[in-house]
Amino acid sequence: TWDNGSWITTSFNTREEYTDFVLSIFKEPGQYNFDNTSFLFNEQARLFNKNGVYCTSPQGSKDYRIYWDHEKNKCRYGAIYKNAGNTWYLPRDYYMWLNFLPIFNKEIQKFGFADVRDAQYHMALYELLAELHYKHSSILKKRQIASSYYHMGKMINQIWFEEGITLKVGASLKDYINDKGSWKFLNEYEAFLNKHTAW
């Protein structure tokens, strides 16, 4: 948890306690009151864009290991941000997607990281709440909001950090999920993570 400038640990004792917390911050899109704290949500992506690397400490050093362990924890458990009476929670896969999984931006025709958008933030919380309630979720969305990239990011998060995971993807057309479609995103993510992270 980032609380007014300091990182602390927040624990939930039960699934119900965790679910209640997520419900307490779930709102309608446009009502999340993002402030300057939201610049921290994708801080690691911006550092990578600036430096060409995530961590400038020498590989294998204590600071290097601390950095990558801290980021791994956020990618496995999510990150809570608090400031001026507001609280935001980035689920594990959303945090990883914003910071460590670049997407191809069709508007500018190059790879980069996703921007923080309240509609995607809302979708991440909505899908997490469905999972916590053992429910399925459906989403009606507009095109070109990187939804396929995000959902492949959810998969790569599980593949990267959980042992023995089995995942399934379905689509109305085979080309949506084969190497012409979303599978391509998994390959892009794998290549980037192998090249630029310590995981």
Question: Where is each model-derived feature located?
Answer:
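Phosphate/NTP-binding elements of NTP-utilizing enzymes
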Residues: T1-W199
